[in-house]
Amino acid sequence: MSEELALENLEHVETSVPHTVFSHANSAPRGKFRSLTLINWNGFFARTFDLDELVTTLSGGNGAGKSTTMAGFVTALIPDLTLLHFRNTTEAGATSGSRDKGLHGKLRPGVCYAALDTINSRNQRVIVGARLQQVAGRDKKVDIKTFSIQGLNLAENPTTIFTDVVNERQARVLTLNELKEKIEQAGAQFKQYHSITDYHAMMFDLGIIPKRLRSSSDRSKFYKLIEASLYGGISSAITRSLRDYLLPENLGVRKAFQDMESALRENRMTLEAIKVTQADRDLFKHLITETSNYVASDYMRHANERRGNIESAVRFRQDWYRARTEQHLSQQRLVELSREAAELAENEKTLEVDHQSAVDYLNLVLNALRHQEKIARYQDDVAEITARLEEQKMVVETATEQLEESQVQVEQVEQEVDQIRAQLADYQQALDAQQTRALQYQQAIAALEKAKTLCGLADLGVKNVEAYHDEFAAHAESLTEQVLELEQRMSISDAAKSQFDKAYQLVCKVAGEIPRSTAFEQAKVLLRDYPTQKVQAQQTSQLRAKLHELEQRYAQQQSAVRLLKEFNQRANVSLEDAEALEAYHAEQEALLEDVSAELSEQVEQRSTLRQKREQLSALYQDNAKKAPAWLTAQAALERLQDQSGETFADSQDVMQFMQAQLVKERELTIERDQLEQQRQQLEAQISRLSQPDGSEDARLNVLAERFGGVLLSELYDDVPIEDAPYFSALYGPARHAIVVRDLDAVKGQLAQLEECPDDLYLIEGDPTAFDDSVLSAQELAHGVVVQVSDRELRYSKFPEIPLFGRAAREQYLEALQQQRDDVTEQHAQRAFDVQKCQRLHEHFSQFVGLHLALAFQPNPEDVMAEIQQQRNEIERELNQFVTTEQQLRIQLDYAKEKMQLLNKLIPQLNLIADESLIDRVEECREQLDIAEQDELFIRQYGATLSQLEPIANTLQSDPEHYERLKADYEQAISQQKQVQQRLFALADVLQRKAHFAYEERVQTENTDLNEQLRAKLDSLQQQREVQKAQLQQKQQQFTNYNRVYIELQTSFNNKMQMLQELLQEVGELGVRADQGAEERAKQRRDELHQVLSDTRQRRHYVEKQLTLIESEAQSLNARIRKAERDYKTQRELVVAAKVSWCVVMRLSRGSDVEKRLNRREFAYLSADELRSMSDKALGALRTAVADNEYLRDSLRLSEDNRKPENKVRFFIAVYQHLRERIRQDIIKTDDPIDAIEQMEIELSRLTDELTRREQKLAISSESVANIMRKTIQREQNRIRMLNQGLQNIAFGQVKSVRLVVNIRDTHAMLLDALSGTQEEYQDLFTDQRMTFSEAIAKLYQRLNPHIDMGQRTAQTIGEELLDYRNYLDLEVEVYRGADGWLRAESGALSTGEAIGTGMSILLMVVQSWEEESRRIRGKDIVPCRLLFLDEAARLDAKSISTLFELCERLDMQLLIAAPENISPEKGTTYKLVRKIAGNQEHVHVVGLRGFGATA
């Protein structure tokens, strides 16, 4: 609440509420209501009432708040505003239409709560309640929201949960959201419910209410029970509908009946659908057949007409094209002749130019011949001068070498003479010893100094001069050896270098300037070709003669080829070789003979061809008659191949496949029968396990009913699935036993039994309280050991399929049903396969009987096509005969002209056949060119190559180290001169050594030396004179040789210059001047002159032919115009029909019906026959579609022959209409044609299958009667058990209360009729037009004609008759005083007796609900039991004590309201006193315990 309210004074309960423990049949304790909390109610701001485990009494005066407290409890229990209506027992004239139901006035403004604190069998604390709040307005509405709280500690006070303390005297009521936050903070679970159904489902699952309240009717029953308890008495609302309260609805049996009836209904509907489908099949066949005939005949008639128009158009087009071809050929010939005339004119001009060129060429050849003679003379001169020039050059070189040697010798002699003269002069000055001694001494000293200077020896002296002299002498000797070696190497290199240079110069002279490194390779090339060139040069004259001869033959061949070309052009042939010419000549010779013979043969051949054409026409007609039947056979064969998925090449394949189908059918039939047997076994097993008590033997049920007992399996029908194997093994073979109350009473009946199992077990016991503790058993891992007696043990294993426990049977039933469904599906598939095989075999049998003889014969249409082709060829041949004669005459004229040309060509055939002549001419010409080039080369360089040949090998190694060797030699000479000068200086000192000591002896020696020098000087002077004379002689010789060489060189250059000029002039002329050139040029000129005259004659002939062709072109143009006009007229017809035909083709192909319409067998019918067929089909279709507006309109539109596409649209409409009528639950295809085929296969199978299914699904009237009796018996036993708890109840004069269950007489008659064998009633259950519910309703009406059924249908009445509750009358009776057992009615009982009796009835209802709900609630949950009683003052103290004893015995809580003068001795009593303090009002509560006992 938003405002704060004063907190009421809460008095503590003076005595604690006792906790009484009750023993229950179940092991779990029963749930209890712990307290009731009211927040912000009228008079109660925050009050919690702790509830006693037995009786809680609210004591107080009028208006103390007792009814308000009970209203809060009921509101928390059933928060449904459509049901809540609080009034007291004194309220009169209260109606349900009152706006205020009593709840709005009991609340205060703001948030209000009504909550119940409970603890269930699981020791879980659960607080459930409702948040209430007044809604402003005149309607006095109340807003209710339900919630639950779980997980709170038991010590938590409910009052503190819903309020928030502000101070010591004030508190605030929490809103629902604040309450949720507070609970979540405390760690508990808060849940709000948006529907009363969810709220009650939670209360049921947790054991707060005894019954699951699924709907508003269930809530209404619960509220009426509470209301009846609250106000007391025997409630007529409950007693009138006591069956609904006490007897549970047998949903399983009812649903089983409904499922079976639904299956039967569906089965019968399917059978009706099959019958409709069979009618549809006939309709399909009729519509498809007539529509196909109607549309396909018109389709093929238009196709035939279109084909005929196209053939006519093609024929006209061929005539047109043939005329155009002739025109084209004529124009082509005109063009060719025009081109030929132009070419001839052009050739004529060209030949004139060529003829003039030939004349000019002859002049050039003559001029070239004159130049060639000069060239030959100059070439001879040049060759001669070249040879002399080479010889003279060698002479000059030899003279040059000799001159150089002489000059060297003269220079050496001059040097020696000068040295001797110098020595003589030196010695001449020292002749006088006295005069020269000092001079000699000084000279010796000077020589010594000079030696020191030259030798670079500072320590040189007289003593060591000899040693130094020896050293320098040895050095000079080694240098001399080195110089000699270098001189030797120089001489060798000088010779090699001279030969290499000479050879290199020769190579450069021939090949031009080339690198020294490639000189040898070039020399090898030149020398390799040199012998061949010499041979070629020698053959030049022979080659010229050969070339002249070949050119003459070639000119003759060209003349023959031109003649052959002219012949080919005129004869319009392309003969290239002699063989062809000879063959053509023979052909032309035979042509004249053959023409006459061929003309005579044509008559005979024409008659033969005409006879053959007639035979082919007869054969064509035979095949045309056979073609429709063959096409029909092929269509049937294709259908069989499509159906079977096989390809048949011949009739043997068909027969083999039929045999294989028979084998396959037998195998499938065996599989189908096996599956049917397996299915029957499964259904039998399912039927046995589906019995309500699980009995597999129906005789046991009869015996149990006869003995008044119950099957043991029925007693254990509710055991859990995990305990079922244990109990089944516990009883072993006795699990099929019958539990009876008295064995002695049954023993007398055993001898009279006729139908009885081999072993019948009877167990004495109370079926209502049967206990298995009499058996001594021990449970093992896989079974149970039972001590039967002291000397007998029985061990029973746990069965896989336990008899006990509905849950175990249902689980196994699910597996069996799934297995049965799988087997049923497989059986249906095998049955379908069998039907398919049978149908396929039937189709094959029909095919063998009707079409096998034709199906595998050759295609008549292919044969007809071949015949037509042969006929066309014959027609062409006959047409050719017409033109052959004219062609032969033309050939004869041509042949004569050709023979004249051939006579000219025949002698020259060998020449024409010589194809290699031109090659040989070219080859010879090339050889001559090469020979002439070689001849010129040999003339120019023959002598040079002769000189090069012996010394060419010197070019292999280039003496390129010669210069370095020369440098080394000069260096060695220089070193030798230096060493010799030093040695000479040392020798001079050594010679002057004696001057230092022996002056006289030296003088004597000098004199001798002087004489020797003079003698040597004279000898050298003589030698010098001789050398000078020789040198002068060699110089004169060299001058003469050199002059001759220069003269030869000048002459060679002049000759070569003139030769080059002549060669250049000949080259500029561009002709070859050989011996036959002049003759060839003259022959060429004469030939061109002849060709020119022939060309002029041909041109005149061609111009005449052109004039003739132009005159024939006019008649050909008129023929072309006529043919074109006929073709275009026919083509317009084809094009006009093509538009609608394209629409027809597009529709047929787009809708996939072209194959249905293109009936090839109709192509052989005439237009009248097809039109007649279409008209007949149209009449049949008008009748067939008279009831279908859409098809009737489509058919009417299709009758317009100007639009054939409408017929295709009608076919598509029929096709679509039939496709929509296909039963997809039976036929798995969209194609009506295939649907017809599948119908044939499927309908018979489905009919048999559904007939068998209906027989199995059919509900037996006897079985229904047995089920009803069994269910009634079970409920009678249950009511009997409930009566046991009411036997000792006494209220006033009422000593006992009981429930009486009786079967209505009308319904008993019905059960007897159902289980009887009266034939008069069997017509109702064998009528397949009625369901079982309708049949049982009809039977009820027959048995009870006096009962008015009202407006209810038979189906509704039958469904009510399948509910066992409608068979029973349930009444409450009391045993009262001397009256005995009386029907419990309020008028016959006092108020207290009525209240006690009504409370007893309510306890029976609650207990019945608990038993009914035990199967769907947790096994460890025992629900709370609590009833109300307002105004308990209507009962006396003894009745109240009896009520308290009943509560204690049934472990039930009771909440009563009593005035202040009522003080129960047991339970908890709350004293309620309403107090008013100022403007505030509250109820003062004091709790007491049993104060009456202490008074």
From Swiss-Prot:
Assigned GO CC terms: cytoplasm; nucleoid
Coiled coil: 322-693, 861-1140, 1233-1289
Signal sequence interval, chain numbering: none
Main location: cytoplasm
Compartments (UniProt record): Cytoplasm, Nucleoid
Keywords: ATP-binding, Cell cycle, Cell division, Chromosome partition, Coiled coil, Cytoplasm, DNA condensation, DNA-binding, Nucleotide-binding
Stretch list, region Flexible hinge: 692-809
Binding annotation for ATP: 60-67
Keyword presence, Protein biosynthesis: no
Entry comment, domain topic: The hinge domain, which separates the large intramolecular coiled coil regions, allows the homodimerization, forming a V-shaped homodimer.
PANTHER family assigned to the protein according to its UniProt record, in alphabetical order: CHROMOSOME PARTITION PROTEIN MUKB, DUF4476 DOMAIN-CONTAINING PROTEIN
Protein name as annotated: Chromosome partition protein MukB
